[in-house]
Amino acid sequence: MSAQPTLCVRPADGYTARVPRYPLGYRRGTTQAQEENMYKILDRVDYSDDVYVQVIEAPAIAVACQPGQFIILRIDEEGERIPLTIADFDREAGTITIVVQAVGKTTRQLQRLGRGDSLANFIGPLGIPSEIEKVGTVICAGGGIGVAPIYPIARALKDVGNKVISIVAARNQNLLLWEDRMAEISDELIVTTDDGSRGRHCLVTEPLKELCEAGGIDLVYAIGPGVMMKFCAKTTQPYGVKTLVSLNSIMVDGTGMCGACRCSVGGQTKFVCVDGPEFDGHQVDFDQLLARQRQYLPQEKESLDAYLVNVGVTKVA
């Protein structure tokens, strides 16, 4: 008889997290034949050598999904668990869309899967959903693959009557993601590239500062690499504009029990998985966050190198 997941988990510092008795995606009483048909990849699109999109069949998760939440997946029974923000969801079709950048062993292993392949575990929706309400004029700034998780948030903000100004940023035009999708749900779209190959030749913070200086901005969402979110928050702080960021941290269980995703917000310890992933960008200790993200780089490189040798790849494109 399978043991039930814990209802209440308590990390070392006394934080208490309430989690569902059976999180969506937790397998109970399924046969091998049933499991082989679960979490099937229905579609796959490659945007570059390293960035790809997968549409996963997960009806129980899709029906409960809200903007800002994430999933944790595992490719096979021996694989690691990785968190990925939900880029889109279709409740009627029962699908979840994820956008992935292949940077380590697991994301490159996932990159080799295509239509018809299945995942061993796909758990969610996790995290606190975005607070979607009409506030006025909202800037949604997405950097790199951060455009994907900001898309459902921007869409929801537009649906409730906000004016949405979107900034889509990337290092170059080949790395721009979902520019067309963001244009469809935005009142104004600004495109920037670091090398000037498309849109404005500048960093995302330049138009962000200009918009804040002009006034009338009620809320800013910034999602992307940690450094990008750090400087977006620094840019908006002098203008007193509320700025929300979605943190991507090391994570194992997704219930607050392991403590791997802890971060400092306003001088207090928070857990990205149960307290976030969204936080006040002006309160986040980004230096600590970035340092924690780098702490396992040697081990990650060792794991990736071993995997590439195993699959016959000697050099990452």
Predicted regions and their residues:
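Local cysteine-cluster metal-coordination motifs and their immediate loop/turn environment
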Residues: 149, 226, 249-278
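Ferredoxin-reductase
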Residues: 34-117
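Short, surface-exposed secondary-structure boundary micro-motifs
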Residues: 76, 124-125, 266
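FNR/FR-type flavoprotein reductase catalytic core
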Residues: 105-252
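Short Fe-S-cluster ligation motifs
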Residues: 271-275, 279-317
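A generic structural signal for residues embedded in beta-strands
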Residues: 73, 121-122, 263
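Short, Lys/Arg- and Gly-enriched loop/turn segments at beta-strand edges
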Residues: 79-86, 126-133, 273
